[in-house]
UniProtKB/Swiss-Prot annotation:
Keywords: Cell membrane, Membrane, Transmembrane, Transmembrane helix. It comes from Acinetobacter baylyi (strain ATCC 33305 / BD413 / ADP1). It holds the Pfam family DUF1328. It is a multi-pass membrane protein. This is UPF0391 membrane protein ACIAD3602. The chain crosses the membrane at residues 6-26, 30-50.
């Protein structure tokens, strides 16, 4: 998931440099959502690993 978040962040950067504001904003939003989900899943995985 971190890889996909980085890919969407790069797409947002390239789109913003080329002047595509809508695509850049949408890609940034996807990158942020994926990053938050990945961090939450990583934290849950670290916490639950000791309990299994």
């Amino acid at each position: 998931m971190f890889r996909w978040a980085i890919i969407f962040a790069v797409i947002a950067l390239i789109a913003s440099l080329l002047g595509f504001g809508g695509v850049a904003g949408l890609s940034k939003d996807f990158a942020v959502i994926l990053l938050v989900v990945a961090v939450i899943l990583a934290i849950v995985g670290f916490i639950s690993r000791g309990r299994v």
